[in-house]
Amino acid sequence: MNNRVHQGHLARKRFGQNFLNDRFVIDSIVSAINPQKGQAMVEIGPGLAALTEPVGERLDKLTVIELDRDLAARLQTHPFLGPKLTIYQQDAMTMNFGELSTQLGQPLRVFGNLPYNISTPLMFHLFSYTDAIADMHFMLQKEVVNRLVAGPNSKAYGRLSVMAQYYCQVIPVLEVPPSAFTPPPKVDSAVVRLVPHATMPYPVKDIRVLSRITTEAFNQRRKTIRNSLGNLFSVETLTEMGIDPAMRAENISVAQYCQMANYLSENAPLKES
Protein backbone atom coordinates (compact mmCIF):
# COMPACT_ATOMS: atom_id res chain seq x y z
CA MET A 1 0.00 0.00 0.00
CA ASN A 2 1.20 3.52 -0.80
CA ASN A 3 2.26 5.02 2.55
CA ARG A 4 1.45 8.49 1.23
CA VAL A 5 -2.28 7.63 1.21
CA HIS A 6 -4.22 8.25 4.44
CA GLN A 7 -8.03 8.09 4.73
CA GLY A 8 -8.22 7.95 0.94
CA HIS A 9 -6.20 11.14 0.45
CA LEU A 10 -2.82 11.12 -1.29
CA ALA A 11 -0.41 13.33 0.65
CA ARG A 12 0.95 16.03 -1.65
CA LYS A 13 4.67 16.71 -1.41
CA ARG A 14 4.34 20.24 -2.75
CA PHE A 15 2.09 21.11 0.22
CA GLY A 16 4.44 19.37 2.69
CA GLN A 17 1.62 17.09 3.86
CA ASN A 18 2.21 14.61 6.69
CA PHE A 19 -0.97 13.55 8.48
CA LEU A 20 -1.01 13.09 12.26
CA ASN A 21 -2.58 9.76 13.27
CA ASP A 22 -1.31 8.90 16.78
CA ARG A 23 -4.20 9.16 19.26
CA PHE A 24 -1.99 9.71 22.33
CA VAL A 25 -0.12 12.55 20.58
CA ILE A 26 -3.37 14.09 19.34
CA ASP A 27 -4.92 13.99 22.84
CA SER A 28 -1.76 15.51 24.35
CA ILE A 29 -1.81 18.39 21.86
CA VAL A 30 -5.51 19.10 22.41
CA SER A 31 -4.95 19.09 26.19
CA ALA A 32 -2.10 21.57 25.76
CA ILE A 33 -4.27 23.84 23.60
CA ASN A 34 -7.23 23.52 26.01
CA PRO A 35 -9.84 25.06 23.67
CA GLN A 36 -12.91 26.63 25.29
CA LYS A 37 -16.31 27.59 23.89
CA GLY A 38 -16.52 31.25 22.94
CA GLN A 39 -12.83 31.54 22.04
CA ALA A 40 -11.71 32.57 18.53
CA MET A 41 -9.94 29.33 17.60
CA VAL A 42 -8.17 29.24 14.22
CA GLU A 43 -6.50 26.15 12.74
CA ILE A 44 -3.89 26.40 10.00
CA GLY A 45 -3.67 23.33 7.76
CA PRO A 46 -6.39 21.09 9.22
CA GLY A 47 -5.61 18.36 6.70
CA LEU A 48 -7.67 15.24 7.48
CA ALA A 49 -9.03 16.78 10.71
CA ALA A 50 -6.84 14.87 13.20
CA LEU A 51 -6.81 17.95 15.45
CA THR A 52 -9.89 19.61 13.97
CA GLU A 53 -12.27 16.91 15.22
CA PRO A 54 -11.23 16.77 18.91
CA VAL A 55 -10.85 20.57 19.09
CA GLY A 56 -14.13 21.12 17.22
CA GLU A 57 -15.99 18.81 19.61
CA ARG A 58 -15.29 21.31 22.40
CA LEU A 59 -16.38 24.38 20.42
CA ASP A 60 -19.43 25.94 18.80
CA LYS A 61 -17.38 27.55 16.03
CA LEU A 62 -13.95 26.93 14.51
CA THR A 63 -12.15 28.79 11.73
CA VAL A 64 -9.82 26.76 9.51
CA ILE A 65 -7.37 27.79 6.78
CA GLU A 66 -6.63 25.04 4.23
CA LEU A 67 -4.79 25.53 0.94
CA ASP A 68 -5.56 22.08 -0.51
CA ARG A 69 -8.86 22.32 -2.40
CA ASP A 70 -9.70 18.62 -1.93
CA LEU A 71 -9.16 18.76 1.83
CA ALA A 72 -11.18 21.96 2.15
CA ALA A 73 -14.05 20.24 0.29
CA ARG A 74 -13.89 17.24 2.65
CA LEU A 75 -14.19 19.56 5.63
CA GLN A 76 -17.24 21.32 4.15
CA THR A 77 -19.09 17.99 4.04
CA HIS A 78 -17.76 16.65 7.36
CA PRO A 79 -20.64 14.78 9.08
CA PHE A 80 -20.58 16.62 12.41
CA LEU A 81 -17.99 19.39 12.06
CA GLY A 82 -19.25 20.96 8.84
CA PRO A 83 -21.82 23.37 10.37
CA LYS A 84 -19.31 24.60 12.97
CA LEU A 85 -16.58 25.44 10.48
CA THR A 86 -15.72 28.65 8.68
CA ILE A 87 -13.32 27.50 5.95
CA TYR A 88 -10.82 29.74 4.17
CA GLN A 89 -9.46 27.83 1.17
CA GLN A 90 -6.26 29.85 0.80
CA ASP A 91 -2.59 30.08 1.69
CA ALA A 92 -2.11 31.09 5.35
CA MET A 93 0.78 33.28 4.17
CA THR A 94 -1.80 35.56 2.51
CA MET A 95 -4.17 35.65 5.49
CA ASN A 96 -4.74 38.95 7.28
CA PHE A 97 -4.99 37.73 10.87
CA GLY A 98 -5.66 41.26 12.11
CA GLU A 99 -8.82 41.50 10.02
CA LEU A 100 -9.85 38.00 11.13
CA SER A 101 -9.47 38.98 14.79
CA THR A 102 -11.60 42.07 14.18
CA GLN A 103 -14.30 39.94 12.49
CA LEU A 104 -14.34 37.48 15.40
CA GLY A 105 -14.29 40.25 17.99
CA GLN A 106 -11.36 39.02 20.07
CA PRO A 107 -7.70 37.93 19.90
CA LEU A 108 -7.12 34.67 18.05
CA ARG A 109 -5.96 31.34 19.43
CA VAL A 110 -4.07 29.84 16.50
CA PHE A 111 -2.96 26.20 16.20
CA GLY A 112 -1.95 23.65 13.61
CA ASN A 113 0.29 20.90 12.33
CA LEU A 114 2.22 23.22 10.02
CA PRO A 115 3.68 22.10 6.68
CA TYR A 116 7.41 22.01 7.39
CA ASN A 117 8.31 23.55 4.04
CA ILE A 118 6.67 26.88 4.98
CA SER A 119 6.87 26.87 8.78
CA THR A 120 9.61 29.50 9.17
CA PRO A 121 8.19 32.12 6.77
CA LEU A 122 4.74 31.49 8.25
CA MET A 123 6.13 32.18 11.75
CA PHE A 124 7.42 35.56 10.58
CA HIS A 125 4.05 36.31 8.94
CA LEU A 126 2.25 35.53 12.22
CA PHE A 127 4.69 37.59 14.30
CA SER A 128 3.50 40.67 12.41
CA TYR A 129 -0.01 40.05 13.83
CA THR A 130 0.84 39.34 17.48
CA ASP A 131 -1.36 42.27 18.57
CA ALA A 132 -4.30 40.21 17.27
CA ILE A 133 -3.20 36.84 18.69
CA ALA A 134 -3.69 35.46 22.23
CA ASP A 135 -1.52 32.38 21.76
CA MET A 136 -0.28 29.84 19.20
CA HIS A 137 0.32 26.08 19.39
CA PHE A 138 2.15 24.46 16.49
CA MET A 139 3.55 21.12 15.49
CA LEU A 140 6.87 21.87 13.80
CA GLN A 141 10.08 20.17 12.80
CA LYS A 142 11.95 19.61 16.08
CA GLU A 143 14.94 21.50 14.70
CA VAL A 144 12.72 24.58 14.18
CA VAL A 145 11.39 24.35 17.75
CA ASN A 146 14.99 24.11 19.00
CA ARG A 147 15.76 27.32 17.09
CA LEU A 148 12.66 29.08 18.47
CA VAL A 149 13.62 28.38 22.09
CA ALA A 150 17.43 28.66 21.78
CA GLY A 151 19.39 31.15 23.85
CA PRO A 152 22.67 32.90 23.03
CA ASN A 153 25.93 30.94 22.74
CA SER A 154 24.32 27.94 21.04
CA LYS A 155 24.37 26.71 17.43
CA ALA A 156 20.57 26.71 17.26
CA TYR A 157 20.37 30.40 18.23
CA GLY A 158 19.70 32.57 15.20
CA ARG A 159 17.50 35.24 13.68
CA LEU A 160 14.37 33.12 14.24
CA SER A 161 15.24 32.79 17.95
CA VAL A 162 15.70 36.55 18.37
CA MET A 163 12.56 37.56 16.51
CA ALA A 164 10.36 34.87 18.12
CA GLN A 165 11.52 35.80 21.62
CA TYR A 166 11.16 39.51 20.88
CA TYR A 167 7.46 38.95 20.13
CA CYS A 168 6.57 35.94 22.30
CA GLN A 169 7.23 33.76 25.28
CA VAL A 170 8.27 30.45 23.68
CA ILE A 171 7.52 27.19 25.53
CA PRO A 172 8.32 23.67 24.22
CA VAL A 173 5.40 21.32 24.92
CA LEU A 174 5.92 17.84 23.46
CA GLU A 175 8.29 15.84 21.23
CA VAL A 176 6.71 13.70 18.50
CA PRO A 177 8.34 10.79 16.60
CA PRO A 178 7.98 10.26 12.81
CA SER A 179 5.81 7.18 13.47
CA ALA A 180 2.96 9.47 14.60
CA PHE A 181 2.40 10.55 10.96
CA THR A 182 1.35 9.17 7.58
CA PRO A 183 3.60 9.30 5.62
CA PRO A 184 6.32 9.42 8.32
CA PRO A 185 8.51 12.51 7.86
CA LYS A 186 12.28 12.02 7.76
CA VAL A 187 12.71 14.23 10.85
CA ASP A 188 11.53 14.38 14.45
CA SER A 189 8.76 16.84 15.31
CA ALA A 190 7.79 18.85 18.37
CA VAL A 191 4.92 20.99 19.63
CA VAL A 192 5.59 24.54 20.79
CA ARG A 193 3.46 27.17 22.52
CA LEU A 194 4.02 30.84 21.65
CA VAL A 195 2.36 33.50 23.81
CA PRO A 196 2.73 37.11 22.59
CA HIS A 197 4.11 39.36 25.32
CA ALA A 198 1.41 41.48 26.97
CA THR A 199 4.14 44.06 27.57
CA MET A 200 7.24 43.94 25.39
CA PRO A 201 10.27 43.17 27.61
CA TYR A 202 12.59 44.94 25.15
CA PRO A 203 10.55 47.46 23.13
CA VAL A 204 12.07 48.64 19.85
CA LYS A 205 11.22 51.87 18.06
CA ASP A 206 11.28 50.35 14.54
CA ILE A 207 10.91 46.60 14.03
CA ARG A 208 12.38 46.94 10.53
CA VAL A 209 15.69 47.99 12.09
CA LEU A 210 15.78 44.94 14.39
CA SER A 211 14.99 42.75 11.39
CA ARG A 212 17.80 44.32 9.37
CA ILE A 213 20.41 44.00 12.14
CA THR A 214 19.59 40.36 12.86
CA THR A 215 19.55 39.49 9.15
CA GLU A 216 22.97 41.05 8.55
CA ALA A 217 24.50 39.59 11.71
CA PHE A 218 23.28 36.00 11.21
CA ASN A 219 23.93 35.96 7.46
CA GLN A 220 27.60 36.22 8.49
CA ARG A 221 27.38 34.41 11.80
CA ARG A 222 31.02 33.24 11.78
CA LYS A 223 32.27 36.83 11.59
CA THR A 224 32.69 39.07 14.61
CA ILE A 225 30.09 41.83 14.76
CA ARG A 226 32.80 44.45 14.25
CA ASN A 227 32.93 42.96 10.71
CA SER A 228 29.38 41.76 10.07
CA LEU A 229 27.80 44.98 11.39
CA GLY A 230 30.70 47.32 10.66
CA ASN A 231 28.59 49.21 8.11
CA LEU A 232 26.08 50.05 10.88
CA PHE A 233 28.13 50.46 14.08
CA SER A 234 31.62 51.64 14.89
CA VAL A 235 33.72 49.73 17.41
CA GLU A 236 33.42 52.75 19.71
CA THR A 237 29.61 52.73 19.51
CA LEU A 238 29.41 49.01 20.29
CA THR A 239 31.78 49.46 23.23
CA GLU A 240 29.72 52.40 24.56
CA MET A 241 26.64 50.12 24.51
CA GLY A 242 28.55 47.51 26.52
CA ILE A 243 28.68 45.10 23.57
CA ASP A 244 32.01 43.43 22.83
CA PRO A 245 32.87 44.00 19.13
CA ALA A 246 34.73 40.66 19.13
CA MET A 247 31.50 38.72 19.76
CA ARG A 248 29.72 36.84 17.01
CA ALA A 249 26.02 37.02 16.16
CA GLU A 250 25.22 33.96 18.29
CA ASN A 251 26.76 35.54 21.42
CA ILE A 252 24.44 38.57 21.50
CA SER A 253 21.24 38.45 23.57
CA VAL A 254 17.77 39.51 22.46
CA ALA A 255 18.03 42.52 24.80
CA GLN A 256 21.32 43.57 23.19
CA TYR A 257 19.92 43.26 19.66
CA CYS A 258 17.00 45.47 20.72
CA GLN A 259 19.42 47.97 22.28
CA MET A 260 21.36 48.11 19.00
CA ALA A 261 18.14 48.55 17.00
CA ASN A 262 17.04 51.48 19.16
CA TYR A 263 20.44 53.15 18.86
CA LEU A 264 20.23 52.89 15.07
CA SER A 265 16.61 54.11 15.01
CA GLU A 266 17.64 57.23 16.93
CA ASN A 267 20.86 57.94 15.05
CA ALA A 268 20.30 56.58 11.53
CA PRO A 269 16.56 55.93 11.09
CA LEU A 270 15.30 54.02 8.06
CA LYS A 271 13.33 56.01 5.52
CA GLU A 272 9.61 55.28 5.35
CA SER A 273 8.97 52.73 2.60
UniProtKB/Swiss-Prot annotation:
Q: What are the subcellular locations of this protein?
A: Cytoplasm
Location, primary (coarse class): cytoplasm
Q: Which InterPro entries match?
A: KsgA/Erm, rRNA_Ade_diMease-like_C, rRNA_Ade_Mease_Trfase_CS, rRNA_Ade_methylase_Trfase_N, rRNA_adenine_dimethylase, SAM-dependent_MTases_sf
Q: What are the binding positions for S-adenosyl-L-methionine in this chain? A: 18, 20, 45, 66, 91, 113
Q: Give a short account of what the protein does.
A: Specifically dimethylates two adjacent adenosines (A1518 and A1519) in the loop of a conserved hairpin near the 3'-end of 16S rRNA in the 30S particle. May play a critical role in biogenesis of 30S subunits.
Q: Which NCBIfam families match?
A: ksgA
Q: Which family does it belong to?
A: Belongs to the class I-like SAM-binding methyltransferase superfamily. rRNA adenine N(6)-methyltransferase family. RsmA subfamily.
* PANTHER family in the cross-refs: DIMETHYLADENOSINE TRANSFERASE (PTHR11727), DIMETHYLADENOSINE TRANSFERASE-RELATED (PTHR11727:SF7)
Kindly provide the name given to this protein in its UniProt entry. Answer: Ribosomal RNA small subunit methyltransferase A
Q: What is the lineage of its organism?
A: Bacteria, Pseudomonadati, Pseudomonadota, Gammaproteobacteria, Enterobacterales
Identify the gene encoding this protein. Answer: rsmA
